[in-house]
Amino acid sequence: MKYTISVKASPQDSKATKTVIDLIYELLERKHLIERVFFQHDGALQALSTGETAVGQEHLLSLWKSLADLDIELAVCISSAAKRGVSQKSNSLADGFELVGLGQLISAIEASDRYIEVF
């Protein structure tokens, strides 16, 4: 099966973020495909290059980078990113993430068997 995942959770909600990352790895282990991970609303903050987590927690940005290294597309809604100060121009967009329009979410949903939203 092919999945599209929309992440709306802020990186400050590290439990939701870690859960979705674990879900993606579980899906990959079961030989499912990830069409795209789309970050919107406060989820766009996941792509902030200066992303930090609370002491004692795994560095979430490095976990996202590991997924990008597996050729998982990490697409960030350009409108959500702009409202939250995430941009390529200011070098605040982390490596492995790409700014895209909302149409990329729609096309990914159409190409997928399942769509999951994480708040």
Task: Place the predicted regions along the sequence by residue.
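Short, glycine-rich nucleotide/cofactor-binding loops
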Residues: 3-18, 46-52
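Short, active-site-adjacent cap segments at secondary-structure transitions
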Residues: 44-47, 83-84
